[in-house]
Amino acid sequence: MNATRKQRLWLVIGVLAAAALAVTLIVFALQRNMSYLFTPSQVRAGEAAGYQQFRLGGMVKAGSIQRAGDSLKVSFIVIDKNAATQVEYTGILPDLFRDNQSVIANGRMQGGRFVANEVLAKHDETYMPKELKDAMAQGHLGKPVPATVAPLTAPR
């Protein structure tokens, strides 16, 4: 093997090693930032037990919203057809947050309750994220969830 071929071989090996290192770092970064969505039924079944941080999706139970008088702390219950999970959140809730509305809370389980660091409310009366609709449909024993299609309109 002459010197030019040897130099090219080391260059190719170096480029491949750098690419492998970059891919490995990207995969680890994406895994740390992934947030899985679970319904209250899945949480109760223990499917979320291995996740430190995850999203909880469902409906806000009517009459369950309790606000602390001296702080921004709010407590409410997220339900699906088969289970309920107590949620605590400290912060300003979205304007569309209310009873019987679809909600997604990002946070972690702590002492049997879900402590949220972010709460998202659905943005209109017909929208439900596909992953939440699919997850809730699995919890509806024998009852299909109706399609939720909202017409797209261009901003004016």
Swiss-Prot record:
Compartment(s) of residence: Cell inner membrane
Record's GO cellular component terms: plasma membrane
KW Kinase (keyword) present: no
Record topological domains on the Cytoplasmic side: 1-8
Binding of heme, residues: 123, 127
GO biological process: cytochrome complex assembly
Keyword terms, alphabetized: Cell inner membrane, Cell membrane, Cytochrome c-type biogenesis, Heme, Iron, Membrane, Metal-binding, Signal-anchor, Transmembrane, Transmembrane helix
Membrane topology: Single-pass type II membrane protein
Gene3D superfamilies reported in the protein's UniProt record: Nucleic acid-binding proteins
SUPFAM superfamilies per record: Heme chaperone CcmE (SSF82093)
Cross-referenced Pfam families: CcmE
Ranges that cross the membrane: 9-29
Residues in the Periplasmic compartment per record: 30-156
InterPro entries, sorted: CcmE (IPR004329), CcmE-like_sf (IPR036127), NA-bd_OB-fold (IPR012340)
MF terms in GO: heme binding; metal ion binding
Record's keyword annotation contains Iron: yes
Family: Belongs to the CcmE/CycJ family.
Matching PANTHER family: CYTOCHROME C-TYPE BIOGENESIS PROTEIN CCME HOMOLOG, MITOCHONDRIAL
Cited function: Heme chaperone required for the biogenesis of c-type cytochromes. Transiently binds heme delivered by CcmC and transfers the heme to apo-cytochromes in a process facilitated by CcmF and CcmH.
Protein name, UniProt field: Cytochrome c-type biogenesis protein CcmE 1
